[in-house]
């Protein structure tokens, strides 16, 4: 079998293009989800990490029945430390975070535009997933 420089170049370019296309397809399927928690020395941060691990299923991970991730296909969730409830609500409302832990009073104040959120537009799109 004889190889030419042009043939090797063409094969190399084809391999790079194929790899690039495959990587682009995987990258397009990825979804990221952030969970605002609390300080790293407190309870909410590790709880957020457990939730993030439970809902994540990165591409290439083992199947659920083989001991791998059982979460949402293509999702990479991460717990992010924060200064707490007010910080988490503000981060969600600004689009910086997808979700976050918040005390019920802070969530209520954000929803109604009262309390520590007095003077701000009521966050009528804010939703509760669970009470801690």
Model-found features: residue ranges?
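Bacterial N-terminal signal peptides that target proteins for export
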Residues: 1-13, 19
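Cleavable N-terminal signal peptides
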Residues: 14-15, 25
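Sec/Tat signal peptide C-region and signal peptidase I cleavage site
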Residues: 21-27
């Amino acid at each position: 079998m004889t190889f030419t420089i042009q043939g090797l170049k063409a094969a190399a370019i084809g391999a790079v293009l194929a790899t690039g296309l495959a990587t682009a397809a995987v990258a397009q399927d990825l979804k990221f989800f952030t969970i605002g928690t609390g300080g790293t020395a407190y309870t909410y941060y590790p709880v957020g990490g457990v939730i993030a691990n439970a809902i994540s299923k990165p591409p290439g991970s083992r199947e659920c029945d083989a001991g791998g991730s059982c979460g949402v296909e293509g999702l990479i969730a991460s717990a992010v430390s924060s200064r707490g409830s007010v910080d988490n609500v503000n981060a969600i409302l600004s689009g910086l975070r997808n979700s976050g832990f918040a005390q019920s009073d802070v969530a209520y104040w954000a929803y109604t535009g009262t309390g520590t959120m007095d003077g701000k537009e009521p966050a009528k799109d804010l939703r509760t997933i669970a009470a801690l």
